[in-house]
Amino acid sequence: ENQVGLHYQIHRGIGVHHRAAMDRNESLQVAITVGGSPAMSLAAVMPLPEGLTELTFAGALSGRRVRMIRGSHAPVYADADFAIVGRVDPTATMPEGPFGDHLGYYSLQRPFPFMKVEHVWHRKDAIWPFTVVGRPPQEDTTFGQLIPELTDPIIPTVIPGVKAVH
């Protein structure tokens, strides 16, 4: 009860923070937010280099700092339509999957961490955005096409010597 399974890449983003909390044998405070500005949605799906946060990228895209709400919980994105806040135990897992992917294959069921939900907030008239995922072309294909348009111009400045990525 009051749990949310978390399925993420253990070597990136939240996985790095979770590993650090595990090494300290501490629970990890997490805020899952849904909705808000298009810049935040785009930042969430971008393959950003380590060290460049989604918040920084979204702020750069929108031309202003991302507003956050701070309290006794993890910081929460102020413009989100929904926020689910809780803690991830350093060692507890639950089965997640199988999941279908956009090529028509399924991943295996595996143990993943889960969050014990402490708070759920939502805006009045909130909207839960989603995309239809499946064999291309689907809605998620648009994100895949947009990413190179945004990243191709900056590749040479981020990776010296590389002129293009195909």
Where are these regions (language model features)?
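Internal alpha/beta scaffold segment
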Residues: 2-45
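Charged, compositionally biased interaction regions
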Residues: 36-166
